[in-house]
């Protein structure tokens, strides 16, 4: 679900960017390996995160503030559990995404800062165990944090929507595991930004 995008470009097309690898904001989708690059390019399609970046820029312009460059990248794969997600292709490609961000910022002579890492993995988890889901997500956050540290980036804020399922899926290990994760997420900064029922949702929970 996280790899879906709507048609671009962004309103601030030269400020909402992705690595210049001809993949765009949606990432590899677990189908290949990301490539190293120190260049950036405008996005052809807009993920949820790209739309958020575009809105943040619009608000900064309304306040007559400077407009930074915002780099957006989603990475997904076919992991069946949260534990698998933390050891699979998506997180490996995310590591290279962080390295590309640092390389691009160095080329431009500016600093790199990660505003947030968005976690979007609930209905996909097939463990059947809410506690196993929680433990897998904690391990995933630890894996991402360590990867960012290797790239010289600070510990991130993790954002997630509190997934409430769909009209037909109202129970599940991931859905119930969110409650476990909300009160026990280790020493990571995890913020549930909003419940999914606050938004219009399609039949796939998107």
Regions of interest found by a model, annotated:
Residues 1-206:
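Cell-envelope and extracellular/periplasmic
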């Amino acid at each position: 679900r996280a790899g879906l995008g709507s048609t671009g470009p962004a309103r601030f097309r030269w400020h909402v960017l992705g690595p210049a690898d001809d993949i765009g904001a949606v990432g590899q989708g677990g189908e290949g390996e990301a490539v190293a690059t120190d260049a950036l390019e405008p996005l052809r399609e807009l993920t949820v995160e790209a739309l958020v970046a575009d809105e943040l820029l619009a608000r900064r312009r309304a306040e007559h503030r400077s407009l930074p460059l915002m780099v957006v990248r989603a990475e997904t794969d076919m992991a069946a559990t949260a534990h698998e997600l933390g050891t699979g292709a998506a997180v490996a490609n995310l590591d290279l995404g962080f390295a590309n961000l640092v390389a691009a910022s160095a080329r431009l002579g500016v600093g790199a800062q990660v505003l947030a890492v968005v976690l979007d993995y609930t209905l996909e988890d097939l463990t059947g165990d809410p506690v196993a889901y929680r433990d897998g997500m904690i391990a995933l956050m630890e894996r991402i944090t360590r990867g960012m540290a290797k790239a010289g980036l600070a510990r991130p804020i993790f954002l997630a929507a509190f997934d409430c399922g769909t009209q037909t899926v109202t129970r599940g290990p991931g859905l119930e595991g969110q409650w476990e994760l909300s009160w026990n997420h280790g020493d990571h900064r995890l913020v549930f930004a909003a419940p999914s029922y606050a938004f219009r949702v399609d039949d796939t929970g998107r």
